[in-house]
C-alpha cells in the first residue's frame, strides 16, 4: 500500500496556531504531510521564504511525518513531483470557500488525479489569519494565543518599536 501523502500549501507569513491546528488534524488522516511554502509573486511577505521555512520547521520539529518545503510554479506540478494526490486546505469562513473552491476546481481540471480536502478550522481559530497576527504584533498586542513561541519571538524582532504590553 502506498503512503498517503498530502500537501498543505500556503504563504505561512507567518505560521499561526490555526495553521498548526490543520497540520495536526491532517496527521490523523495522512501518513505524510508536506507543508509547502509557495513563492507567491502577488504577495510581499514580512518574512522571507527562508525565515518562514525555519519558523515552520521549529513549529513542527516534534512531528517527523511533517516535511517542510517550498515551491515555485503551479501547485499541480509540485504535487506530481512529490507523488502526492491530495491538497489539504483549511477553511475559516464562507468567504474562504469561494476562492478555495475555484482553485480546487482548476487544480482538478489540470490533473484529474488530484483532490482537495477542505478542513474547517477549529472554532477557536476561525477568525485567525497571518495578516491579523501581524497587525496585532505591530501594535504591541498580546499574540501568545495566536502563534507558536518561535513566531512570537520573530515578530518581536520584526517590530522592535511596537509598544509592549508584556
Curated annotation (Swiss-Prot):
<dbReference type="GO" id="GO:0004595">
    <property type="term" value="F:pantetheine-phosphate adenylyltransferase activity"/>
</dbReference>
<comment type="similarity">
    <text>Belongs to the bacterial CoaD family.</text>
</comment>
<comment type="pathway">
    <text>Cofactor biosynthesis; coenzyme A biosynthesis; CoA from (R)-pantothenate: step 4/5.</text>
</comment>
<feature type="binding site">
    <location>
        <begin position="11"/>
        <end position="12"/>
    </location>
    <ligand>
        <name>ATP</name>
    </ligand>
</feature>
<dbReference type="GO" id="GO:0005737">
    <property type="term" value="C:cytoplasm"/>
</dbReference>
<keyword id="KW-0547">Nucleotide-binding</keyword>
<keyword id="KW-0173">Coenzyme A biosynthesis</keyword>
<feature type="binding site">
    <location>
        <begin position="90"/>
        <end position="92"/>
    </location>
    <ligand>
        <name>ATP</name>
    </ligand>
</feature>
<protein>
    <recommendedName>
        <fullName>Phosphopantetheine adenylyltransferase</fullName>
        <ecNumber>2.7.7.3</ecNumber>
    </recommendedName>
</protein>
<feature type="binding site">
    <location>
        <position position="89"/>
    </location>
    <ligand>
        <name>substrate</name>
    </ligand>
</feature>
<dbReference type="InterPro" id="IPR004821">
    <property type="entry name" value="Cyt_trans-like"/>
</dbReference>
<dbReference type="GO" id="GO:0005524">
    <property type="term" value="F:ATP binding"/>
</dbReference>
<keyword id="KW-0460">Magnesium</keyword>
<feature type="binding site">
    <location>
        <position position="75"/>
    </location>
    <ligand>
        <name>substrate</name>
    </ligand>
</feature>
<comment type="function">
    <text>Reversibly transfers an adenylyl group from ATP to 4'-phosphopantetheine, yielding dephospho-CoA (dPCoA) and pyrophosphate.</text>
</comment>
<feature type="binding site">
    <location>
        <begin position="125"/>
        <end position="131"/>
    </location>
    <ligand>
        <name>ATP</name>
    </ligand>
</feature>
<comment type="subunit">
    <text>Homohexamer.</text>
</comment>
<dbReference type="GO" id="GO:0015937">
    <property type="term" value="P:coenzyme A biosynthetic process"/>
</dbReference>
<keyword id="KW-0548">Nucleotidyltransferase</keyword>
<dbReference type="Pfam" id="PF01467">
    <property type="entry name" value="CTP_transf_like"/>
</dbReference>
<feature type="binding site">
    <location>
        <position position="43"/>
    </location>
    <ligand>
        <name>substrate</name>
    </ligand>
</feature>
<keyword id="KW-0963">Cytoplasm</keyword>
<feature type="binding site">
    <location>
        <position position="100"/>
    </location>
    <ligand>
        <name>ATP</name>
    </ligand>
</feature>
<feature type="binding site">
    <location>
        <position position="11"/>
    </location>
    <ligand>
        <name>substrate</name>
    </ligand>
</feature>
<dbReference type="InterPro" id="IPR014729">
    <property type="entry name" value="Rossmann-like_a/b/a_fold"/>
</dbReference>
<keyword id="KW-0067">ATP-binding</keyword>
<dbReference type="InterPro" id="IPR001980">
    <property type="entry name" value="PPAT"/>
</dbReference>
<feature type="binding site">
    <location>
        <position position="19"/>
    </location>
    <ligand>
        <name>ATP</name>
    </ligand>
</feature>
<keyword id="KW-0808">Transferase</keyword>
<feature type="site" description="Transition state stabilizer">
    <location>
        <position position="19"/>
    </location>
</feature>
Amino acid at each position: 500500500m502506498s503512503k498517503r501523502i498530502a500537501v498543505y500549501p500556503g504563504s505561512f507569513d507567518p505560521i499561526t496556531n490555526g495553521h498548526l491546528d490543520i497540520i495536526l488534524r491532517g496527521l490523523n488522516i495522512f501518513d505524510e504531510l508536506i507543508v509547502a511554502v509557495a513563492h507567491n509573486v502577488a504577495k510581499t511577505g514580512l518574512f522571507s521564504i527562508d525565515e518562514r521555512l525555519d519558523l515552520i520547521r521549529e513549529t513542527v520539529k516534534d512531528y517527523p511525518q511533517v516535511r517542510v518545503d517550498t515551491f515555485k510554479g503551479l501547485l499541480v506540478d509540485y504535487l506530481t513531483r512529490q507523488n502526492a494526490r491530495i491538497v489539504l486546505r483549511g477553511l475559516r469562513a464562507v468567504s474562504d470557500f469561494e476562492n478555495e473552491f475555484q482553485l480546487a476546481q482548476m487544480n482538478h481540471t489540470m490533473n484529474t488525479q488530484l483532490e482537495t480536502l477542505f478542513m474547517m478550522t477549529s472554532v477557536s481559530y476561525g477568525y485567525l489569519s497571518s495578516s491579523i497576527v501581524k497587525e496585532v504584533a505591530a501594535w504591541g498586542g498580546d499574540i501568545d494565543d495566536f502563534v507558536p513561541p518561535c513566531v512570537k519571538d520573530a515578530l518581536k524582532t520584526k517590530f522592535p518599536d511596537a509598544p509592549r504590553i508584556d
